[in-house]
């Protein structure tokens, strides 16, 4: 380890000002409000890079968050489904329940929940690319009667829900 650190010492010194930069970002986030427009801009700059780009390195569910591996999970898709199920076990949706997913991404959780449980699911995103993909995905799965994908900011929600999920 010491040899690796010694070889990288020049690189380490390049980042010596990083702490100052991190503190400045912290202060910036305190004083710059996360408005609806700012949120939409930030999401668009990242998630609207193109679905093809994300499909190159995400699993087949296009889930963009950490998976949960256990002894049975052999690959990333299994581990993502394992995560979905653990979240469902936490929210315990009942038959006919109304469930909200905030930040639905490309619709992986919506598809999983919609196929396995008799619920009404509202899914929201502010990414145009994710919305288009998720809407088409749910339609292809025949779940459009149970799952409603919308472009909407969570601050604009008016409905009441039995459960709310948001995967980070």
Question: PLM ranges: what are they?
Answer:
Residues 2-57:
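N-terminal auxiliary segments of SAM/dcSAM-dependent transferases
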Residues 60, 64-65, 71, 75-96:
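Conserved alpha-helix/loop element of class I SAM-dependent methyltransferases that forms part
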Residues 95-103:
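Conserved class I S-adenosyl-L-methionine
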Residues 106-118:
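Conserved SAM-binding loop of SAM-dependent methyltransferases across substrates and taxa
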Residues 120-125:
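Conserved SAM-binding motif I beta-strand of class I
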Residues 134-135:
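Conserved SAM-binding loop
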Residues 141-154:
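Conserved SAM-binding strand-loop segment of SAM-dependent methyltransferases
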Residues 155-164:
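A short acidic, Gly/Pro-enriched loop at the edge of an enzyme's catalytic core
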């Amino acid at each position: 380890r010491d040899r690796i650190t010694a070889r990288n010492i020049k690189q380490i010194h390049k980042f010596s000002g990083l702490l100052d930069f991190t503190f400045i970002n912290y202060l910036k986030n305190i004083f710059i409000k996360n408005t609806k427009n700012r949120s939409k801009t930030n999401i668009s700059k990242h998630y609207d890079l193109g679905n093809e780009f994300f499909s190159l390195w995400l699993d087949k569910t296009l889930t963009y968050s950490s998976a949960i591996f256990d002894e049975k999970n052999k690959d990333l898709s299994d581990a993502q489904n394992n995560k979905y199920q653990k979240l469902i076990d936490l929210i315990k949706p009942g038959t006919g329940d109304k469930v909200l997913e905030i930040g639905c991404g490309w619709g992986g959780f919506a598809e999983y929940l919609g196929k396995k449980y008799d619920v009404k699911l509202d899914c929201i995103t502010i990414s145009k690319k994710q919305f288009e993909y998720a809407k088409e995905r749910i339609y292809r799965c025949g779940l459009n009667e149970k799952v409603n994908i919308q472009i909407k900011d969570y601050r604009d929600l008016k409905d009441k829900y039995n459960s709310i999920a948001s995967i980070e």
